[in-house]
């Protein structure tokens, strides 16, 4: 048996909390201006029509409507489609 504690054990034992990234609103889901659609590191998903891009690459809705995800030329894009008023 060892008479001393393992060398690195006192320097271990910490972990950072998860950053809560990912898609926050699904395809076809209703959003209002300011709703966060995607939280991400870098532009894994690119902004399309009627969405804004924050300085931390958060994609958010600029208008009221429904979320639409699509792929163009190997780029994932998110749009917000305006709901036709009746």
From Swiss-Prot:
Spans annotated as Disordered: 1-22
The keyword Phosphoprotein is assigned to this record: no
Gene3D superfamilies cross-referenced by the UniProt entry: 2.40.50.100
Residues that span the membrane, as ranges: none
A molecular function GO annotation: structural constituent of ribosome
GO biological processes: translation
Keywords: Ribonucleoprotein, Ribosomal protein
PROSITE patterns (alphabetical): RIBOSOMAL_L27 (PS00831)
A Pfam family recorded for this sequence: Ribosomal_L27
Domain of life from the UniProt record: Bacteria
InterPro entries, A to Z: Ribosomal_bL27, Ribosomal_bL27_CS
GO CC terms of this entry: ribonucleoprotein complex; ribosome
Family, similarity comment: Belongs to the bacterial ribosomal protein bL27 family.
Name under which the protein is recorded: Large ribosomal subunit protein bL27
Gene encoding the protein: rpmA
């Amino acid at each position: 048996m060892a008479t001393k504690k393992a060398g690195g054990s006192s320097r271990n034992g910490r972990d950072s909390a998860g950053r809560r990234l990912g898609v926050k609103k699904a395809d076809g889901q209703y959003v209002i201006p300011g709703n966060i659609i995607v939280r991400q590191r870098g532009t894994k998903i690119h902004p399309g029509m009627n969405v804004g891009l924050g300085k931390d690459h958060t994609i958010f809705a600029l208008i009221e409507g429904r979320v639409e995800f699509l792929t163009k030329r190997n780029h994932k894009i998110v749009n917000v489609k305006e709901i036709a008023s009746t």
